[in-house]
Design a protein with these regions (language model features):
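C-terminal alpha-helical cap/extension of soluble enzyme domains
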Residues: 218-294
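Short N-terminal signal/transit or membrane-insertion segments
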Residues: 22-34, 183, 256-269
């Protein structure tokens, strides 16, 4: 099936009452793991990477093109519908480069801005992306971040959400409704009433960030209230590190190191980390209801 528009993937999810995960990758192995899981589960995929927890000098030197190019090539070869997302870019210039390198969906990290500034910046992104055939996600409201003692949250106001979407023509709206960035363990309390109120007045699919902290029992009720996409990342990195550490500990003394680094075989310690991510993402696709929808 290959490259697909994110807005089409999310429209189908919203209509069907399920969520599609954006599983945030950071390199070749994690990108491949996400696509392998999608093909195994026959789930639509949103492949991509983010700028929020990635070194900015590296991204600005060549990282945007490197990761966007990898994700695009995988999407083109996919047997399921696959979009390519640059998530939470720090600048409009990064978005410009991401679009040129193959991303067909973008999001500017603008939720910290005052409403008027966020509105103006989002309009600039839409003016870049839509003529290039790319979709735009924006976040309105502000999530807490578990890395910084929670911080302050600003829940999304339904009336503001409606006006913002109408004024910007974005394709997806990330909302603050109880989820928390970088929280593990499914302890977030999702405000389902707020989701219902927003979905009733907003024409585009809703998105929840902070997926690692969303309890499993809240996922399908959120999907029934307009949420079509969940962003997920924290536990993927933990799974990768656990698989890598376990594999590295088992490398025999005096072994041919080529068998364990870069071989792309089952012995390769990086492939072992990739397998852990694939297993985790596959299970989440089942939980989100997207398995079997491609």
């Amino acid at each position: 099936m290959g490259v697909a528009r994110m807005r089409d993937i999310l429209a189908a999810a919203r209509k069907g009452g399920y969520c599609v995960g954006y599983f945030e990758a950071w390199d070749q192995y994690s990108l491949e793991a996400c696509l392998e899981a999608a093909e195994l589960m026959r789930s639509p995929a949103i492949l991509g990477f983010g700028a929020a927890v990635t070194d900015q000098p590296w991204l600005d030197r060549w990282g945007v093109e490197e990761l966007a190019g990898l994700a695009r090539r995988l999407a083109e070869a996919a047997t399921v519908p696959a979009a390519v997302l640059f998530n939470e870019a720090r600048t409009v210039e990064q978005i410009r480069r991401g679009l040129a390198a193959g991303c067909n969906a973008v999001m500017l990290d603008s939720s910290h801005m005052p409403y008027a500034e966020n509105l103006a910046a989002t309009r600039d992104v839409v003016a870049l992306a839509h003529p290039a055939g790319a979709d735009v996600e924006v976040e309105l409201g502000h999530l807490k971040d578990a890395r910084f003692d929670g911080g302050e949250a600003a829940m999304t106001d339904p009336a503001e959400a409606r006006a913002f979407v109408e004024d910007t023509r974005v394709d997806a709206l990330a909302v603050a409704a109880g989820s928390v960035h970088s929280m593990a363990g499914g302890a977030a309390k999702i405000d389902l009433e707020r989701l219902s109120a927003i979905s009733a007045v907003v024409r585009v699919p809703l998105v929840l960030h902070g997926g690692s902290g969303i309890p499993p029992e809240a996922i399908l009720p959120a999907a029934a209230r307009g949420v079509a996409k969940i962003n997920y990342g924290l536990r993927m990195k933990r799974a990768f590190l656990e698989g890598l550490a376990e594999a590295a500990a088992g490398v025999p003394t005096g072994a041919d190191i080529h068998d364990y680094i870069g071989a792309k075989t089952a012995r390769d310690v990086m492939v072992r980390g990739q397998a852990r991510v694939r297993e985790l993402v596959s299970g989440l696709m089942r939980a989100y209801g997207s398995a079997g929808k491609a």
